[in-house]
C-alpha cells in the first residue's frame, strides 16, 4: 500500500495473524507490528465489555511508549463470555476442552475492545470503541469436542476456540460482526480511522 502524504503510518499493537489478515482485507498494511505484553487478568467482578476496552487501551498505550515517530496505533482485545462469566484465553488442552464444553449448545457473547491512538508531534488523540457479537454453538458431542481439542487451534484463543477455523462448523447462529469474532471489528476500525483523518479509501 502506498501511503498518502496525509496518512500517518499504521502500527498494529498485536502479532495476531487474524488481525493482520483483517487489516489486509481493507487494504491496510501496518508499517510496524509490535506485540504489547500486558497483564490481562480481569479485575475482581470486572464485566466482559469494560475488560475488553481496558485491555485494548493498555495495549495501545504500551506501544505508544515504545515508538518515537508520529503514527496511528491500533490495539484490540477480544473477550468471550457466557453471561457475566469471562472465559479464559486457553493455554492448555484442558482449558480448551473446558471452554468448548461451556460453549456447547449455548449462546455466548464476543466483545472486542478497540483503541486507536493518533500520535502526532507528541500529541495523543484517543478513540475507543466496543463491538459485540452474539454466537450460539450447536450442542456438541463428546466426539466433536475431543476432535476439536486435538486440533490445538483453540490454544491461545479467547474462549478456547478459533471461529475462523474448524469451530466455524459449530455455529448455529450468529448476530453481529463476524470480523469482531475474529478479533478486529472492521466497521468500527474503518470509521474510527476516518474520524482521525486517515484516508482509508485512498
From Swiss-Prot:
EC number: 3.6.1.9
GO cellular component terms attached to this protein's record: cytoplasm
Cofactor: a divalent metal cation
GO BP term, pick one: nucleotide metabolic process
SUPFAM superfamilies: ITPase-like
One Pfam short name: Maf
Source organism superkingdom: Bacteria
Cellular compartment(s): Cytoplasm
Keywords: Cytoplasm, Hydrolase, Nucleotide metabolism
InterPro entries linked: ITPase-like_fam, Maf-like
Major site of localization recorded for this protein: cytoplasm
Location of the active site: 77
Listed GO MF terms: nucleoside triphosphate diphosphatase activity
Catalytic activity reported: a ribonucleoside 5'-triphosphate + H2O = a ribonucleoside 5'-phosphate + diphosphate + H(+); a 2'-deoxyribonucleoside 5'-triphosphate + H2O = a 2'-deoxyribonucleoside 5'-phosphate + diphosphate + H(+)
Function: Nucleoside triphosphate pyrophosphatase. May have a dual role in cell division arrest and in preventing the incorporation of modified nucleotides into cellular nucleic acids.
Protein family per UniProt: Belongs to the Maf family.
NCBIfam families registered for this protein in UniProt: maf
Name of this protein: Nucleoside triphosphate pyrophosphatase
Organism expressing this protein natively: Rickettsia canadensis (strain McKiel)
